[in-house]
Each structure stands twice: as structure tokens, then as C-alpha cells.
């Protein structure tokens, strides 16, 4: 029997509907709406497309949205000055700088320049520290890990006491989702193992998992024989493996051999249509949370 598909597209619709209702309520109560500035440096097609989607989503929810499109020759000092401007702008509740940046700009300097209380990507060291502490100290959750946790909760996956194996140790996905799953709370309380390129016998670790979260960036890395029967498999990978000759669009594959693994797993996310749609939804949720914190 094939696994149940966890659709990030459908869950995203639910979340955006809830956010839109909350924005209407906020406007009625406080006379303001969430404000988000998106800052893009250069003309990378992938970054331009992603920023465009973020802007479109924000506007559809009734946010106040400001777009700053800067030349690839913009200096680090100029970018820092622009961030400072929006840090001090009370109409802006979220400051988002699209990564990656041109090589002459130090990304960490830019991330740390953003006001932690407007850091809706949750990349600032202060927000990473708050995540480590947990509880009421957490203002924002990193967007992709938050999307994963939301998918687990809304699809009825029991996490308390579960064996969770995270494949990948990036600062954006692997480390934060492992930390979040180990915390006390809803969608957490799990026993977590992180595995990576330096781990021995990857398959053995994966076979222990009640919940397997794969963020390795290697297409079709995880095979069906790595899966515990009935496990929940969350595939974070988005790998371009070619181009469709008829449509000209990229062919995407996850880190999991989806067709084979779905015959073993109990629940599984597809690529595309799984974790991907959740990331922007959680960015909007963070921006709303920031706006409410600044307004109340």
C-alpha cells in the first residue's frame, strides 16, 4: 500500500488563509498591516523569481510591501545603510535580504545588521540563540524548518517520543530542525539524531527513524531499503537534474527515491509540492508575528 502524500501545497493554502484573516483583524484593531521589505542585490534569475513570489504572496495577504532592487555593484556599506533605514522604519516589521549575495559582500555582516526583532528569516545569531533556549524566548522560527514542523503537526504525525533522523547539518535546515524537534512542545519532544557526510553507515541510522527528514542536496540519495516500514519521510531536497524538452522547465528531484520509497513509508512529501511551498508561508507567518508584537 502506497504512503499517504503530505501536500505542502494544500497545507500552505490553509496557513495563508489563516494569515489573511489575521491581517484583516489586525487592520480593524490597530489600523495597520504587516510591512515587509525585500532587498535583492543583482539579477540572479533564481533569486529574482523567488523574490517575486514572496512579493506576490505578501500583497495577496494584504501586507504593505516594499521592494528594493539593487545593482550587483552595490557596496556592502550601501547595503548596510539601507538595512539600517528599514530597521528604524516603524511601518516595516520584516527585513528580508535575499541570499546569496555577490561575493564582494560579507553575508554574515548583512545578516547580523538586521534588527533581530525584524529578522523574519530567523538567520540572526540572536534568533538562533533564542531557538537554542526555546520556550517564550523564541520570536521567529527559521522558515523551512518551521514549515516541516507545521506539516508534521497538521498531517497528524506523532512526534513525542519518536525517533527522528535528520540527514544534513546545514545552518538553514538540518541544525535548526533537529533543535526544534528536540524541544518541549507541539510537534517536538522527539529523540533526534543528525547524520551527515561524515557519518558511518547512513542507511542503518535512517532505518531507525520513525520520522526521516532529508536535507542533503543529493538527488535520490535515500533508497527504499533505508526506510522503516510505516515511517514518515520528509524530503527537503530540490535538485535540478535536467530540462524537460517539451516545456523547457527544469526537472526536479528530491533527496529521496520517491516512487520506490512511497511503497514502504507511511507518509511522504513529494518534490515538488512538499516542503517547498511551506517556506514562504512561514516567512509570512513570521512577518505577521513581528507586526503583532510591534503593534500590541
From Swiss-Prot:
Enzyme Commission code: 1.5.1.5, 3.5.4.9
Pathway: One-carbon metabolism; tetrahydrofolate interconversion
Stored PROSITE patterns: THF_DHG_CYH_1 (PS00766), THF_DHG_CYH_2 (PS00767)
GO MF annotations in UniProt: methenyltetrahydrofolate cyclohydrolase activity; methylenetetrahydrofolate dehydrogenase (NADP+) activity
Pfam families recorded: THF_DHG_CYH, THF_DHG_CYH_C
Domain of life: Bacteria
Record keywords: Amino-acid biosynthesis, Histidine biosynthesis, Hydrolase, Methionine biosynthesis, Multifunctional enzyme, NADP, One-carbon metabolism, Oxidoreductase, Purine biosynthesis
Cellular component, GO, one term: cytosol
Family matches, as InterPro entries: Aminoacid_DH-like_N_sf (IPR046346), NAD(P)-bd_dom_sf (IPR036291), THF_DH/CycHdrlase (IPR000672), THF_DH/CycHdrlase_cat_dom (IPR020630), THF_DH/CycHdrlase_CS (IPR020867), THF_DH/CycHdrlase_NAD-bd_dom (IPR020631)
An example Gene Ontology biological process: tetrahydrofolate interconversion
UniProt cross-references to SUPFAM superfamilies, sorted A to Z: Aminoacid dehydrogenase-like, N-terminal domain, NAD(P)-binding Rossmann-fold domains
Record's subunit section: Homodimer.
Role this protein plays: Catalyzes the oxidation of 5,10-methylenetetrahydrofolate to 5,10-methenyltetrahydrofolate and then the hydrolysis of 5,10-methenyltetrahydrofolate to 10-formyltetrahydrofolate.
Protein name: Bifunctional protein FolD
Organism: Desulfotalea psychrophila (strain LSv54 / DSM 12343)
Amino acid at each position: 500500500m502506497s504512503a499517504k502524500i503530505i501536500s505542502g501545497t494544500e497545507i500552505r493554502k490553509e496557513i495563508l488563509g489563516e494569515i489573511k484573516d489575521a491581517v484583516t483583524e489586525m487592520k480593524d484593531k490597530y489600523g495597520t498591516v504587516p510591512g515587509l521589505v525585500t532587498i535583492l542585490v543583482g539579477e540572479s534569475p533564481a533569486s529574482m523569481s523567488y523574490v517575486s513570489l514572496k512579493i506576490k504572496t505578501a500583497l495577496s495577504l494584504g501586507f504593505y510591501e516594499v521592494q528594493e532592487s539593487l545593482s550587483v555593484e552595490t557596496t556592502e556599506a550601501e547595503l548596510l545603510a539601507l538595512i539600517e533605514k528599514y530597521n528604524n522604519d516603524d511601518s516595516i516589521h520584516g527585513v528580508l535580504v535575499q541570499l546569496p549575495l555577490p561575493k564582494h559582500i560579507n553575508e554574515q555582516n548583512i545578516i547580523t545588521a538586521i534588527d533581530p526583532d525584524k529578522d523574519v528569516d530567523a538567520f540572526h545569531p540572536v534568533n538562533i540563540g533564542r531557538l537554542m533556549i526555546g520556550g517564550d524566548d523564541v520570536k521567529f522560527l527559521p522558515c523551512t524548518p518551521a514549515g516541516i514542523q507545521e506539516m508534521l503537526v497538521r498531517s497528524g504525525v506523532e512526534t513525542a517520543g519518536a525517533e527522528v533522523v535528520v540527514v544534513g547539518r546545514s545552518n538553514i535546515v538540518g541544525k535548526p530542525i533537529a533543535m526544534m524537534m528536540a524541544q518541549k512542545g507541539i510537534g517536538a519532544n522527539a529523540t533526534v539524531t543528525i547524520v551527515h557526510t561524515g557519518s558511518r553507515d547512513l542507511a542503518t541510522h535512517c532505518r531507525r527513524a520513525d520520522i526521516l527528514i532529508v536535507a542533503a542536496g543529493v538527488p535520490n540519495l535515500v533508497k527504499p531499503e533505508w526506510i522503516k516500514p510505516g515511517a514518515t519521510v520528509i524530503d527537503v531536497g530540490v535538485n535540478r537534474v535536467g530540462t524537460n524538452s517539451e516545456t523547457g522547465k527544469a526537472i526536479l528531484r528530491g533527496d529521496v527515491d520517491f516512487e520506490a520509497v512511497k511503497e514502504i513509508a507511511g507518509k511522504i512529501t513529494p518534490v515538488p509540492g512538499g516542503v517547498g511551498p511551506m517556506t514562504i508561508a512561514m516567512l509570512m507567518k513570521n512577518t505577521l508575528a513581528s507586526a503583532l508584537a510591534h503593534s500590541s
